């Protein structure tokens, strides 16, 4: 589906990935999904590596601790090369998602309080990657927030969110 979307969009697909949480007891456990964070992290890392292999358009044989693929070829190949960008989401200030994101193309830190925290994110990722060139930092704020401080802190993408008050 990712390669199809990349082709149909003319190369504008971005894959977002994160561990997820079972806060309400309905997001993971209701479907029998793994609940241990470390195991889910290992599964995510393996899955992203496998997806990257599959995007190559070459024949893939993979036998990992969590996933198997035997003689699989994905076509069409993505328009974007060397691959579709991958953005990693994670709760600030947890370090594991930052380390994971530094290996990919972007980071969407959840629960940032202010631009200074985004600046801290940027510094950590720069220290891991050596540069922020070609790397996206995504922020989510209220629609009436001023983007200038976030841009100065390193934001490359801006998402506006609306809170729906269901009590009224």
Segments predicted by a language model, with ranges:
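Active-site-adjacent structural elements that line small-molecule/cofactor binding pockets in enzymes
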Residues: 1-168
């Amino acid at each position: 589906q990712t390669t199809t979307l990349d082709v149909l969009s003319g190369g504008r697909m971005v894959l977002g990935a994160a561990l997820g949480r079972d806060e309400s007891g309905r997001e993971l456990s209701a479907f029998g999904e793994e609940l241990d964070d470390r195991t889910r992290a290992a599964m995510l890392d393996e899955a992203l590596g496998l997806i990257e292999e599959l995007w190559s358009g070459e024949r893939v044989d993979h036998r990992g601790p969590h996933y198997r693929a035997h003689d699989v070829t994905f076509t069409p190949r993505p328009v974007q090369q060397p691959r579709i960008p991958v953005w990693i989401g994670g709760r600030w200030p947890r370090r594991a998602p930052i380390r994971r994101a530094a290996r990919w193309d972007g980071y969407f830190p959840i629960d940032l309080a202010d631009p200074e925290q985004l600046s801290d994110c940027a510094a950590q990722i720069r220290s891991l990657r050596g540069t922020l060139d070609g790397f996206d930092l995504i922020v989510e704020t209220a629609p009436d927030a001023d983007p200038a401080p976030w841009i100065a802190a390193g934001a490359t993408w801006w998402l506006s969110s609306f809170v729906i008050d269901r009590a009224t």
